[in-house]
UniProtKB/Swiss-Prot annotation:
Induction: by NRG1 (at protein level). Its EC number is 2.7.11.18. Belongs to the protein kinase superfamily. CAMK Ser/Thr protein kinase family. It is found in: Cytoplasm. This is Myosin light chain kinase 3. Expressed in cardiomyocytes (at protein level). Up-regulated in heart after experimental myocardial infarction at the mRNA level. It comes from Rattus norvegicus.
Amino acid sequence: MSGVSEEDPEGLGPQGLPALGGACLVTVDKKLNVLTEKVDRLLHFQEDVTEKLQCVCQGMDHLEQGLHRLEASQELGLAGPGSTSPAAAQAAWPEVLELVRAVRQEGAQHGARLEALFKMVVAVDRAITLVGSTIQNSKVDDFILQGTVPWRKGSLADGPEENKEQAEVAGVKPKHVLNTGSVQAATSRALWEESQKQDTPVGTVEGLPLIIDTSLKGADLTQAGASLRQGVEALDPGQEPPPTEAESRLPALASEDTGTTLELSVAIDRISEVLTSLRMSQSAGEGTSSSKPDCSEPGPQPLGPLTTDSDIHSDEGLPRISVRMREMTTPEELFETQGGSPIGSAEAPGPGTVLEDQIPKGARPFPPLPKRSCNNGGASAEEATGPGAEPIRGPSLVTRDWRDEPVGTTDLQQGRDPGAVSPEPGKDHAAQGPGRTEAGRRVSSAAEAAIVVLDDSAAPPAPFEHRVVSIKDTLISTSYTVSQHEVLGGGRFGQVHRCTERSTGLALAAKIIKVKNIKDREDVKNEINIMNQLSHVNLIQLYDAFESKNSFTLIMEYVDGGELFDRITDEKYHLTELDVVLFTRQICEGVHYLHQHYILHLDLKPENILCVSQTGHQIKIIDFGLARRYKPREKLKVNFGTPEFLAPEVVNYEFVSFPTDMWSVGVITYMLLSGLSPFLGETDAETMNFIVNCSWDFDADTFKGLSEEAKDFVSRLLVKEKSCRMSATQCLKHEWLNHLIAKASGSNVRLRSQLLLQKYMAQRKWKKHFHVVTAVNRLRKFPTCP
């Protein structure tokens, strides 16, 4: 024994080597722990330095503002009356005198110009007065006031002769028919006066027969017309109203619509004859009827310039007359209604039938009419009937282009035949109009479908500034209104409801977390501490926090786009590879910010990625309940619900680090590109086995047509060895996530992943329901308490 001790004085025998190795391991472990503590101290020191630098920056800002204020006050002091010497002030007096003289000269020049302008205005006023007094009693004024089209072919003296012939043929008129000249003159004057008060006259005078409500008696209308005529005659010739916008456009329209006005005059005469024959036949065959107006009096009754059955509204004693007219060809096509009751024959209107009425109060409105574009000037006129129809805004005189409406057709038809054509081939513009419009819409929709605009801008920041939130013990109801019935989401923690801040009305989200023990409370506090350090547009922001006996409530930023996979599985959403690039890039930017602050998310999955809007490509990462600060050699057991997004080191309970999150990013990217889960098996055990062995491949059908850059991106993330995976910084520099403009110019590939994603989500929902049913069946087997 002594010999052995002499040869081996240090005691390094076969049994001494393990002891020495154990001591070395203990020493290395102690050094690593010391190193970890130093790293933590450095991190805390870095945070303190950052806070102090922010305070210094704020102090510098305040100092700069104070310096600016001081300079401004000094400048004001130097500019004061006592700042300059008397000698300098005396030297500046001549300049001031020169400036005053120049101002006086300019004032005199402006006065002379104003005087000349005043003289010009007086001369123009006199000229207008002369023109008004000249035209006041002319035939042009009579035609304008009587509502007759002044630019029709023929002599201007034809109008009064036609009126005389109509008056001779009129015979016995009903009580409600008024004198043409007085009522129409008063109506035109009333319409002009209303147009001066407001720009929205109810009626439009189109040079067509006026339609007046039968509920008003003839004596009342005659009295109103007489009062209006007295008001018009009382006007001074110098106060003659200027011509309206439509009247000023009459000469221009006269040269364009000469052909159409001939058709209009023929249609008016034809309508007069039709009404005369119809009323004579009604009075001879049917006699008087209680359900019809009094039209059984003997004698022919032409249409005349005035017909009834329209609404007259009074505004400050001035009647408003709404004018409407439709063309008709034969007596069989006439269908006149009053308050919803037919006059004459009660046949249902068909193609070519005309409804000539103005819907009174309480009557059933007609469907809105299609827009018709006028050829003169490109203006468009839209007619609508019913209580909800708005009055036509514009001048009191509106001309209508009758070339767009063929004879025998009308817009107010029930049961209109879409295949009906105009009897005259030269006037089928209205029949071709809808077809052209539909063709134009198809072309525009095809052009819009060919041009797809993708929004690659950054996600919008939170509607509030980043803040360090401290937990409050007060009731949440004192500051926020939580909508318990409006659930935004849920999970292992609890539910997320929509809420509103009482003081500002800001829309927020309230995450209610149930806690049962001290460990749960510590986890929630850890989540709050981590979110206090996050300030990035792709990460959800914390606004407030409340603690109660059995729960925590985190008030966070609200986004209404829904989960990422809920949106891309929508049938109306078409996913392309460029869309996946935009989504993946923003996910990598958020993860890169987390890793820069030594934070691991450890629960990246599609359910924890929200879209900011329903149409854009902006996303935000949520749920930091499992997030941890990075510490070397830490074993972390994750309580997860869906295993196919976990990294092999998490399944094996090994050390986790930054590449753990990048594995989840690779799985999410694979699913976005293909619609398949790379490791999903029939059971959870099979799924974990695939993850541990890293057994996956690119499906030949789903990845057909995708770029090699996309496959390379996924291949460099789904690697079993942690050190071989790309980091978030390397992902952002990858070729696939860059050069978006070039990719957008040549991106015409549409993915087939949408249907596969729908099938995948349906399968997951089915599995969840199956587990719920299984759990319920197991609970039923437990014996019940007596």
